[in-house]
Amino acid sequence: MGETEKRIETHRIRCLSKLKMFLLAITCAFVSKTLSGSYMNSMLTQIERQFNIPTSLVGFINGSFEIGNLLLIIFVSYFGTKLHRPIMIGIGCVVMGLGCFLKSLPHFLMNQYEYESTVSVSGNLSSNSFLCMENGTQILRPTQDPSECTKEVKSLMWVYVLVGNIVRGMGETPILPLGISYIEDFAKFENSPLYIGLVETGAIIGPLIGLLLASFCANVYVDTGFVNTDDLIITPTDTRWVGAWWFGFLICAGVNVLTAIPFFFLPNTLPKEGLETNADIIKNENEDKQKEEVKKEKYGITKDFLPFMKSLSCNPIYMLFILVSVIQFNAFVNMISFMPKYLEQQYGISSSDAIFLMGIYNLPPICIGYIIGGLIMKKFKITVKQAAHIGCWLSLLEYLLYFLSFLMTCENSSVVGINTSYEGIPQDLYVENDIFADCNVDCNCPSKIWDPVCGNNGLSYLSACLAGCETSIGTGINMVFQNCSCIQTSGNSSAVLGLCDKGPDCSLMLQYFLILSAMSSFIYSLAAIPGYMVLLRCMKSEEKSLGVGLHTFCTRVFAGIPAPIYFGALMDSTCLHWGTLKCGESGACRIYDSTTFRYIYLGLPAALRGSSFVPALIILILLRKCHLPGENASSGTELIETKVKGKENECKDIYQKSTVLKDDELKTKL
């Protein structure tokens, strides 16, 4: 008996360690996939400026990830469970690495980035011809011949980013459905929420790392190492600045490939957690069942697909949960993807600072919320109906708190000729002819070049020329323009490069907004695990993998793909001034109407999320009357344990009977 117990204990430890190894590996996979995703979302503004494309096209590039995911999600979700799940996940990680590498390629295939400017590097181009020169001619930085512009290769280099994002989406497909179903299959019923909470925590650590990496890369000039950064006349707060977006994609590619390695050494199946000590007792029974299943799969691997789809489609709670998810994903995809741009435009900070603050204030509370949510589910053994109520009412509380963000606003940047007159009076409608005034009408200034300067009167101007500046001192970012006839101040009128700061009040509003965002993130993350358990428990155990995959499919199709596109188009509609390329074509937007931008960024998600509570309340009503298939999961485990105990009792009876017989034989012989 001692050897048998030792062998069973060894087997238990080995199986337990393999499950823990899978948990560690899948958590790392969630870290790597969310690292890549958050980095991509954070670099949207940099990509927009690098390729001089509108926000709607950037939204399409961002949504292309979902297209790649859709190509495989149903196939992987259903057939993946019939194959070797850990190996499928490992292959997916490698493919994600390939996609990230493809996204970095344009940097190595195109020329150096050139931003629009009237100012030369030395500040002494043709005797300061970029300044106001009455009865003169503006000599701008050299432009290409129009015939050469049409042949410029970099105009379509964004296609590499598009294709790379599609490939990354294809690679990420197996991680969520196969990883979650693997945990559900082999973890204890009461441990499953905690394990999923830990995995989801990895999905928060990844974005935190991704945002920190993005913040660093956004602060490094795109062509660092190839140009002298001391000669730059723009800073990270300038809307023409482009960070080293390509560098982070290379790091993401390496991380994804390294994450794939452990999955190739993990088993496809494990004994149910908690029953490993009795593995030998039920070993033969499991082997017989597995042989029968293999035979069935060989001759009809697809026979259950349509019945499963029909069963899920006729499950009202499952379908309503998908509807809630689609509506809320439309809101959150937009908020997360364009939050750095919102912080830049609303509060006047750099892309690097916006990304950093977004990560520091939002992700730690979400991480803590996921862990606490999982612990609550485990500690108090929350039922599905209780979990649904917790998820719904916490989401409603966070939703009401969200409306306070409408109060934390800053005024538009006052740019003369766009939203402010030369007298400093705000104007609502931008008219191109309004950029000229008596003070600069004879300066022969270009009307479309975005090269802003900040006057010592607190107003910004499109360029030093339009500010009426006649002289300059200094070079690079330290250049100061003097004798500016359009700047109405007492004494010497002067201006410096860049837009004027929005002031200390705006910085205070930014802090309030970030604190509110952190509170909202924590409350909403508390509801995430209970809500996800409703999804898992409203399906039969054999339908879970397909159900999770179909849920992901629907959120991708109806939220992940269209949301960034229509949201980006709405943002483009608030643009006040577009950048100008060498040949006169429109580039990326340089400044938005921050008031309208705020109403779109905050108002549209508020409307979407508000409508999602209607199907959520219907779910609560249905749960009062329905008996969910997942509620039998624990009883299924208990049945197995009862069966095992029954077999153990049979073994004890046989052993006792044999002992009695041996005693009788011994007495007879004596």
From Swiss-Prot:
The lineage of its organism: Eukaryota, Metazoa, Chordata, Craniata, Vertebrata. This is Solute carrier organic anion transporter family member 1A2. GO terms for biological process: bile acid and bile salt transport; monoatomic ion transport; organic anion transport; sodium-independent organic anion transport; xenobiotic metabolic process. Glycans are attached at N124, N135, N412, N419. Belongs to the organo anion transporter (TC 2.A.60) family. Transport activity is inhibited by the grapefruit juice component naringin. It comes from the Eukaryota. Disulfide bonds join C439-C469, C445-C465, C454-C486. A conserved histidine residue in the third TMD (His-107) may play an essential role in the pH sensitivity of SLCO1A2/OATP1A2-mediated substrate transport. Residues 433-488 form the Kazal-like domain.
